[in-house]
From Swiss-Prot:
The name this protein goes by in its record: Serine--tRNA ligase
GO biological process: selenocysteine biosynthetic process; seryl-tRNA aminoacylation
Residue numbers binding L-serine: 230-232, 284, 384
PROSITE patterns given in the database record: AA_TRNA_LIGASE_II
UniProt GO cellular component terms: cytoplasm
The organism of origin for this protein: Thioalkalivibrio sulfidiphilus (strain HL-EbGR7)
Protein transport is among the record's keywords: no
Function of the molecule: Catalyzes the attachment of serine to tRNA(Ser). Is also able to aminoacylate tRNA(Sec) with serine, to form the misacylated tRNA L-seryl-tRNA(Sec), which will be further converted into selenocysteinyl-tRNA(Sec).
Amino acid sequence: MLDPKRLRNELEETAARLARRGFQLDTETFARLEAERKQIQVHTQELQSERNSRSKAIGQAKARGEDIEPLKAEVSRMGEALAEAETRLSALQAELDEFLMGIPNVPHASVPDGLDEKSNVEIRRWGEPRRFDFPVRDHVALGEPKGWLDFETGAKLAGARFTVKRGDMARLHRALVQFMLDLHTREHGYEEVYVPYLVNADSLRGTGQLPKFEADLFHISEHGYYLIPTAEVPVTNLARDTILEAAQVPARFVSHTPCFRSEAGSYGKDVRGLIRQHQFEKVELVQLVPAEQSWDALEALTGHAEKVLQKLELPYRVMALCAGDMGFSSAKTYDIEVWLPGQETYREISSCSNFEDFQARRMLARYRNPETGKPELLHTLNGSGLAVGRTLVAVLENHQDAQGRIHIPEALRPYMGGLEVMDPSV
């Protein structure tokens, strides 16, 4: 959520910056709500002051032996008026808060202009896409014949966009998770956390999925729970309604969870294979840092996600998303896109974002500034390190041979019991 003071003091400038991402801020509605709030707040304060003055007068009149009943009746009437004003103020503040909850984050000045992915800017590349001297198979063709990837049974068990993995494919999937967790905890300084896969609405409001994106979520309405769309939600909310001490920040968390998304609006997209599933898994990186550290933290976090791809010998590129292509809560996002030979293109495998204090303000996540001793809002960041299913796809397609065998990257072999080749003929 944006700082209300920013909107009060810099309304037109903020509206112009939000327009970069294609969002039209309703300045008239905000100005009206804010004016009404201020008017009622002033009226409420005046009533409180007047009631306090009259209450004090009762004591003075009583000490003089005067009749205090008229004063008591007046104080009672003022109390009723004050209660009514406080109710109106509370309702108006709730309306204003709901309005603020629907406003996305302001893009950082370094974010490229543009309204869609065509305006994203390539920052760097790593690795060269492999040149094959045989017809390239995509991951479906590599995984189906042996039954490693069983889309038919997944559809029978649940429906479209679900998959069963068997044998060495399930083992490889598990190996990727363990490899990522070990890398981030041992080399990058993250604390591993295990979190609930079901969360309440407050958690989703804190990170920005609610109220605007409820259609993308799986909702267990009778219990008030939602299946998590990403570990970002429960992990970032570890700091909700909390004041961390200076020694606890910066904090780095890593968590492996399943993720559940309805894929509303994705009908007809990536219907083949593992690229877009209702249920998939990610290893998520979250950082909670003081404001002055967040931009360095974004570069570091992005590098941590990149390191996974480098160790798996997978070519990729890093893209700075333009203002119109960023997520609702983000101030700046880098997408890491891995090369997929089966599609002959780069596909997103991680989004690394700095939210500044946007999420922290929504969830009241703070730390105590050691210099002032006062609580200040944290800056929050997150990124996939990595999406496990898409990493699996990339390993299959980039490390295949002419016989349809998969050569296991050296970094994964200890997690595969020393296995060097997955051979569908064996």
